[in-house]
Amino acid sequence: EVAYQPWQVYRQPGVFHHLPLVDYRFLRVLERLADSKVLNDYFDHNNFILNSFGGAVNNKTMDKNSYLKEIHRDVNYYIKNYPLMMNVLIMLDPFSKVNGAIEILPGSHKVREKPSADEFNTNNIQIVSNAGDVLFFNSYVWHRAGISHILDKRRALTLTYTPSYFKPQADYSEIYINLPDDMKNNFYKAVLGKSSKIVKNLDEWYIDYEK
C-alpha cells in the first residue's frame, strides 16, 4: 500500500506500474534473479536490463474488463526466434484455479497472430503454484489473468527484461543516483540501464573507460 498520489486516478484497480519509482526497496528482488539460468540462457549471456517492474492484485471484485483479463502479450513487436523480452512473474500468494491464476497458451510465442478466444480457451493451461514461486516465460506468449471467485487477494510482482539496447518503459537508471551505498554497485548500474544510457554530451562520450 502507498500513500495517495494524484496519478492514482489514472491507474486501473489492481494494477500497479513501476513500483521502484514509489519505493526503491522493490529492487532488492532483482538480486535474487541475477544468477537465474533461465534469464542468462534466454539472453545468451549478454547484458540485459529491467524493462518494467509492476504488480497485480486479483480477487473477485477486480474488473472483469481489465486488460489483464484479456488475451494479450506484453510486447507489441514480434521478431521470430529472437529473444526480445522475458516476463518474470513472482507469486506473492498461492496461485489457484479459484483465485484466478495466470493462464498461458503453450507454443504461442512461435506465432505472430493473436489466437482466437476459442483456441485459447481450449488449449490454455492455468499455472497453479505456491507463494514464492517464480514463473519465467517468453514475452511473445499469449496469456491472461484468470477469473477469481473469492475475495481474498492474489498478489504478484510482474517484471520484464530486455536486451540492454531496448528502451525501458521507465527511466530506472535515475533511481540509481539515490540508492543506498550497498546498492550502488555494478549489478544495479547494469540492470537499471545506467551503464547503457545514451550520452548527453561529448564529456560523457569521451569519459575514462574505467569509469
Predicted regions and their residues:
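Active-site lining segments that contact anionic ligands and/or coordinate catalytic metals
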Residues: 124, 131, 152-156
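Catalytic core of non-heme Fe(II) oxygenases with the double-stranded beta-helix
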Residues: 64-129, 166-175
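Non-catalytic surface loops within mature trypsin-like serine protease
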Residues: 59, 92-94, 161-163
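Non-heme Fe(II)-dependent double-stranded beta-helix
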Residues: 1-71, 77
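Active-site rim elements
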Residues: 23-28, 122-125, 144-146
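Non-heme Fe(II)/2-oxoglutarate
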Residues: 141, 146-211
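Conserved metal-binding segment of the jelly-roll/cupin
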Residues: 129-143
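A structural signal for short, well-ordered beta-strand segments
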Residues: 52-55, 88-90, 157-161
